[in-house]
């Protein structure tokens, strides 16, 4: 029998961008934009996986995609719960590796205009399940999110 466990963690990442809150928000609101900046680091080298892909950016809508990295099929499955244009996104998502659920998270992304652009604050609460990503799972997720936001900075430049 598989040993069951949960690691709970919350992290907050704040980034300042020289782009309006509206422009930063728009980078999350279209599949084409997210595809341009969302895959970074090692995962940028991953192959797209076959299977259902969705990008339904509305409250109750789903975002779903997958890729294959080092022979493992990763799947991301999200549901949007709150969308306030140019101000806030709240969604939950599950991550899978070869069909095994690795984690369930709630992400809140806030966009605030400033004189020089905007500030994005990403708050994520995660439940990392059954030790599949090891004891460093929260740090790995935060690092991956930080890399992704670096990709957003390059996209907005």
Descriptions of predicted regions:
Residues 12, 32-73:
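Short beta-edge strand/loop motif at the mouth of beta-sheet-based domains
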Residues 1-47:
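Hydrophobic ligand-binding cavity/cleft-lining segments
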Residues 8-14, 50, 62, 75, ...:
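Intrinsic-disorder/low-complexity, polar/charged segments enriched in Ser/Thr/Lys/Arg/Asp/Glu/Gln
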Residues 64-92:
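Helix-adjacent hinge/juxtasegments
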Residues 21-22, 81-88, 110-119, 154:
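A short, structured loop/turn motif at beta-sheet edges
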């Amino acid at each position: 029998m598989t040993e069951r466990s949960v690691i709970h963690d919350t992290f907050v990442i704040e980034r300042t961008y020289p782009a309006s809150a509206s422009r930063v928000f728009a980078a999350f609101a279209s599949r084409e934009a997210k595809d341009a900046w969302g895959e970074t680091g090692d995962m940028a080298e991953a192959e797209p996986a076959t299977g259902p892909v969705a990008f339904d950016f509305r409250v109750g809508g789903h975002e779903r995609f997958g890729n294959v990295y080092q022979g493992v099929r990763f799947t991301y499955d999200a549901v949007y719960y709150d969308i306030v244009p140019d101000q806030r996104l709240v969604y939950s998502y599950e991550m899978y590796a070869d069909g095994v659920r690795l984690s369930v998270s709630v992400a809140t992304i806030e966009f605030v205009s400033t004189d020089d652009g905007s500030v994005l604050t990403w708050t994520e609460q995660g439940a990392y399940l059954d030790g599949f990503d090891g004891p460093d799972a929260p740090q790995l997720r935060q690092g991956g999110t930080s890399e992704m936001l670096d990709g957003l900075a390059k996209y907005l430049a």
